[in-house]
């Protein structure tokens, strides 16, 4: 490859990279793959992105640089041909409670512009459109009447400068006006005696309808006079033979029904601006108030059965009794579960009726009595974030929702799923003038909506909070935003964009990546998904194994150059030389935990059985309700049953089944095992306790009086006090990246010299922490330390033999963190029967890692545990004993159980997308 058509990296040595040379073709779709821990992210993010970003920042002025982060140069000999780099990672990009899907994709900004430019304001009183009128509108109204129809031009009497009506009329007479219309009758001004309650207008002119030029000119003059005298208002009263007079009101002000409305502008629709934000919640949509979920935690109960928890007990129960006694007259159903009540029935319960007082009245009484301690405690117990009573969660002041486009206000649009929003804009009809104004705005909106659909996010709504998105969703929104920004000549680096994406949507994602590349960008993707690897223009495989045994380029080239018998695990799996085998049989099951009536978010009252002592996989397209069912309902409800935890589960009717067969439930996520640099795998799995005891048992340690605690780098004693057991000292630099220097006292060894003199077979405590898990197992096996080997073995079993015992947990990937936790549970041999729940455990895992992960799952099940996994990866799904497939689509069109049973049974279900893709995995064709 020529230098100007490729990015050339020479001698990359970041983390475990072994002085590698890589050439990456520019303006292509490039996939970097390899085992977990092989060095993919070190190449993509710590080398490529770090250097691309650093060079871009260095090209800016020193003034601009002071506002940007300090960037250090990655460890490599040189990098050539690198464009400005943009990283799109699996991180929830915004913790800002105001940030939504709409604002982060810029669709909401364009919606604001659309409503400001072509929105029509409608009066909440009459529903008529609010307009500003001109003399031309008045002439147009007159021309609609037959020739010769009599009419009058009137103006309301405006009292200026604190005058009385009599004083104003005298001034009008001096200006040449002679008549008034009083309560519909004509009268001379000098004959009128003002009375309270009279409707009085100043007569400007009396005319007959005519299309003649002189008549139109006269009306125009009279209308302008009326608007001047009437402070912008003018009235026409037409007198038709045989009918009552018709009155038309015109105004140069933006008003209707006696209300002056605000003219639409883009700030009016911004909840981040004081001009548009709801004055009560200040644009958050929620306020601290009485939380419905705390007052009615179990929505499957009726009012009669005690749904309202604050009305339990003898004294407060009087309020419940009041509702029961008045319910028949009020037409309120006291035996209906709360979740089945209509909006009107819920309003009756909260706001009360003439026959009983509601929950709001109860809490008003509590507030009035909060000088008593028991009432203060009660009020605090039921307070929480609740929907704003003024804007009802729209975040905008009411005036913003008087404006409509295509019959809908902006709050209704942001509540629609993206799929329905697309239909709305596809069918939007505007008049030619408005269509011309809105053409460019609609183009931007439609293209961004299409990008969101292309990355499989059609189930989201624009008002969904950014901080409630999963890492995969957040990354794909950033990807859609990048496409919308249409940058050219950049380097995009993505970290597993297929996370959380069903196989059905992978083709769309590949199409989006291609679009980004075809704009003229280089797209580098760290990925394990087989379809995306096969779709790439160029593949770089880092390996052959992980950690110290990785960091080399084992393959670079395109799909057609793949060779058999390669050192690359990726190549072997792609060519079918290695596979993840199907289990020989599916485990049978009789015991289960059952959830009934799950209806949180988009779940449609589903019933699901989670078998015990087998591996259950919950599948479905993005947004179908998997996480809601498993994490929000099943996990929290089960935890509440077993541990009496306070975390509120989502809405469901009941949990039952063989609960007596379980003792614990564990949710194993990918969060770091410890946030400090001191936390490491060997301490997490409790193996370091045994290692410290072994060193404390050595003759020199006993002679010096060193206890096991002396060999800890977390407490004073044997650790180096200069660096507090860190091994490094961080020097903060003002305008440069912080310097991390090796501690001069211990030379990076974390312990005092006398501590390091204690040795076990020529190895001191620092030497052991520097060993990989594989090396440590070999060392301790040779010297008969079975206890320590037994503790370390699970780390090797889950495929983490390459990590150092003392490696800081902050340097582990999400997948590695999850497997360290899994190793900890595998090490608990005598643990009580536990339900383990995993959320996409294959994130960041190569085919070869998945094989080891499945072996670890089998080991847990053999020990009497049960496993439930939320997963899209078909290699895991095909190995399940039981599959629960949710769908059929995401969002409102999901939330149902489409199929359950063994993978073979699900594959036969025509309505299941998962089933369609499973057929190929269960009956693979030759590669």
Roles of regions detected by a PLM:
Residues 1-927:
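Conserved phosphate-binding elements of NTP-dependent enzyme cores
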């Amino acid at each position: 490859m020529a230098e100007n058509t490729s990015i050339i990296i020479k001698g990359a040595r970041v983390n475990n990279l072994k002085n590698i040379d890589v050439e990456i073709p520019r303006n292509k779709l490039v996939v970097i793959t390899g085992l977990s821990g092989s060095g993919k992210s070190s190449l993509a993010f710590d080398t490529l992105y770090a250097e691309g970003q650093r060079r871009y920042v260095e090209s800016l002025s020193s003034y601009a640089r002071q506002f940007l982060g300090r960037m250090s140069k990655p460890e490599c000999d040189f990098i050539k041909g690198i464009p400005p780099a943009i990283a799109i990672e699996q991180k929830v990009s915004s913790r800002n409670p105001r940030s939504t899907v709409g604002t982060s994709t810029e669709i909401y900004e364009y919606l604001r512009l659309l409503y400001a430019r072509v929105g029509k304001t409608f009066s909440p009183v009459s529903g008529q459109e609010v307009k500003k009128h001109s003399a031309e509108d008045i002439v147009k109204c007159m021309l609609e009447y037959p020739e010769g129809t009599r009419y009058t031009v009137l103006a309301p009497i405006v009292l200026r400068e604190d005058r009385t009506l009599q004083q104003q009329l005298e001034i009008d007479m001096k200006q040449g006006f002679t008549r008034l219309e009083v309560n519909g009758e004509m009268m001379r001004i000098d004959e009128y005696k003002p009375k309270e309650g009279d409707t009085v207008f100043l007569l400007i002119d009396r005319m007959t309808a005519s299309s003649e030029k002189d008549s139109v000119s006269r009306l125009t003059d009279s209308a302008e006079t009326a608007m001047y005298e009437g402070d912008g208002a003018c009235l026409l009263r037409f007198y038709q033979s045989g009918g009552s007079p018709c009155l038309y009101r015109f105004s140069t002000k933006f008003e209707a029904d006696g209300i002056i409305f605000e003219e639409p502008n883009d700030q009016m629709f911004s909840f981040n601006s004081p001009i548009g934000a709801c004055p009560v919640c200040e644009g958050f949509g929620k306020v601290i108030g009485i939380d419905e979920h705390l007052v009615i935690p179990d929505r499957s109960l009726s009012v009669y059965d005690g749904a309202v928890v604050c009305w339990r007990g003898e004294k407060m129960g009087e309020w419940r009794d009041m509702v029961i006694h008045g319910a028949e007259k009020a037409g309120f159903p006291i035996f209906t579960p709360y979740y089945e009540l209509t909006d009107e029935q819920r309003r009756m319960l909260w706001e009360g009726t003439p026959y009983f007082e509601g929950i709001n009245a109860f809490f008003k009484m509590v507030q009035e009595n909060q000088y008593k301690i028991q009432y203060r405690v009660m009020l605090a117990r039921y307070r929480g974030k609740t929907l704003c009573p003024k804007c009802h969660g729209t975040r905008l002041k009411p005036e913003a929702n008087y404006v409509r486009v295509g019959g809908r206000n902006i709050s209704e649009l942001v509540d629609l799923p993206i799929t329905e929003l697309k239909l709305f804009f596809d069918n939007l009809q505007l008049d030619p003038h408005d269509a011309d104004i809105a053409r460019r705005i609609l183009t931007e909106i439609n293209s961004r909506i299409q990008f969101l659909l292309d990355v499989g996010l059609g189930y989201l709504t624009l008002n969904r909070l950014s901080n409630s998105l999963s890492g995969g969703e957040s990354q794909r929104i950033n990807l859609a935003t990048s496409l919308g920004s249409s940058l050219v000549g950049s380097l995009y680096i993505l970290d597993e964009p297929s996370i959380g994406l069903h196989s059905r949507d992978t083709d769309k994602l590949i199409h989006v990546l291609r679009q980004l590349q075809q704009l003229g960008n280089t797209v580098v993707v760290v990925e394990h998904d087989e379809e995306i690897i096969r779709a790439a223009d160029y593949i770089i495989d880092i390996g052959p194994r992980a950690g110290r045994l990785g960091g080399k380029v084992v393959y670079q080239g395109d799909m057609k150059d793949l060779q058999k018998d390669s050192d690359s695990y990726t190549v072997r799996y792609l060519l079918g030389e290695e596979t993840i085998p199907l289990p020989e049989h599916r485990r049978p099951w009789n015991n289960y935990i059952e959830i009934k009536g799950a209806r949180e978010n988009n779940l449609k009252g589903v019933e699901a059985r989670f078998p015990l002592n087998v591996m259950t996989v919950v599948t479905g397209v993005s947004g179908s309700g998997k996480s809601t069912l498993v994490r929000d309902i099943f996990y929290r409800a089960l935890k509440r049953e077993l541990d009496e935890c306070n975390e509120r589960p989502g809405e469901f009717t009941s949990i039952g089944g063989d609960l007596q067969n379980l003792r614990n439930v564990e949710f194993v996520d990918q969060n770091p095992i410890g946030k400090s640099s001191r936390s490491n795998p060997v301490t997490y799995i409790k193996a370091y306790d045994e290692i410290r005891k072994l060193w404390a048992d050595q003759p020199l340690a006993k002679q010096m009086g060193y206890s096991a605690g002396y060999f800890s780098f977390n407490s004073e004693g044997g650790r180096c006090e200069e660096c507090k057991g860190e091994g490094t000292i961080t020097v903060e630099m003002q305008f440069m990246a912080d310097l991390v220097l090796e501690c001069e006292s211990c030379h990076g060894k974390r312990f005092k010299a006398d501590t390091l003199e204690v040795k076990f077979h020529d190895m001191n405590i620092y030497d052991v922490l520097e060993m990989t898990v594989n090396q440590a197992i070999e060392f301790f096996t040779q010297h008969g330390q079975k206890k320590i080997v037994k503790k370390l073995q699970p780390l090797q079993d889950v495929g983490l033999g390459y990590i150092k015992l003392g490696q800081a947990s902050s340097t582990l990937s999400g997948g590695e963190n999850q497997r360290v936790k899994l190793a900890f549970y595998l090490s608990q041999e005598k643990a009580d029967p536990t339900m383990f729940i995993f959320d996409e455990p294959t994130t960041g895992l190569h085919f070869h890692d998945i094989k080891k992960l499945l072996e670890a799952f089998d080991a847990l099940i053999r020990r009497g545990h049960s496993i439930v996994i939320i997963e899209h990866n078909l290699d895991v799904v095909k190995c399940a004993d039981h599959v629960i497939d949710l769908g059929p689509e995401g969002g409102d069109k999901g939330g149902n159980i489409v199929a359950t049973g063994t993978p073979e049974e699900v594959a036969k279900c025509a309505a299941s997308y998962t089933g369609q893709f499973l057929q190929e995995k269960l009956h693979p064709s030759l590669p």
